């Protein structure tokens, strides 16, 4: 087994590249091209790019790629946490991702109800507004 201190710089660069590529694939599959492209474009400056790289590698390339939870379960967990944190734009993206991962409207609604009880009604109400708008938009997109 290799310890972190024994990894050489080329090995580290290769590991980052592998995680980034895996993460980018998962990120596109879950969040969709429009959201990912906008996030990457918004993080394309020299200052902001490292944050997008970290999100893609650590979040999507590492945690989302782990065994043990299905993508739908991860999406529902994110919905609950983002509702509790009152992170509207990210919540909207993850509601869309949950639908893309096979979550039903009922599962999303029940997740938000559960979150509302534990994180507070104002956060839950806001979460419902955001989720309903996303679901409505996605249903309209299907009709077109």
Label each PLM-derived region with a short phrase.
Residues 2-72, 100, 126-144:
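Acidic, glycine/proline-rich low-complexity segments that act as flexible tails and inter-domain linkers
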Residues 70-76, 105-110:
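Alpha-helical scaffolds flanking conserved acidic
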Residues 51, 73, 90-94:
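Amphipathic alpha-helical interface surfaces
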Residues 83-109:
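Mid-chain, well-packed structural core segment of small domains
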Residues 121-125:
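Substrate/cofactor-recognition hotspot
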Residues 55-59, 76-83, 111-116:
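Short alpha-helical scaffolding segments that buttress acidic/His motifs in well-ordered protein cores
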């Amino acid at each position: 087994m290799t310890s972190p201190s024994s990894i050489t710089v080329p090995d580290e660069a290769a590991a980052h590249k592998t995680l980034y590529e895996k993460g980018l694939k998962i990120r596109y599959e879950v969040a969709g091209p429009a959201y990912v492209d906008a996030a990457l474009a918004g993080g394309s400056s020299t200052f902001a790019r490292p944050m997008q790289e970290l999100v893609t590698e650590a979040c999507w390339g590492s945690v989302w790629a782990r065994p043990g939870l299905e993508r739908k379960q991860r999406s529902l967990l994110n919905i609950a946490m983002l509702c509790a944190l009152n992170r509207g734009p990210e919540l909207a993206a993850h509601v869309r991702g949950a639908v893309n991962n096979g979550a039903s409207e009922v599962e999303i609604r029940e997740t938000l109800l559960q979150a509302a009880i534990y994180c507070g009604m104002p956060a839950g109400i806001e979460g419902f507004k955001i989720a309903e708008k996303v679901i409505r938009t996605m249903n309209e997109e299907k009709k077109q």
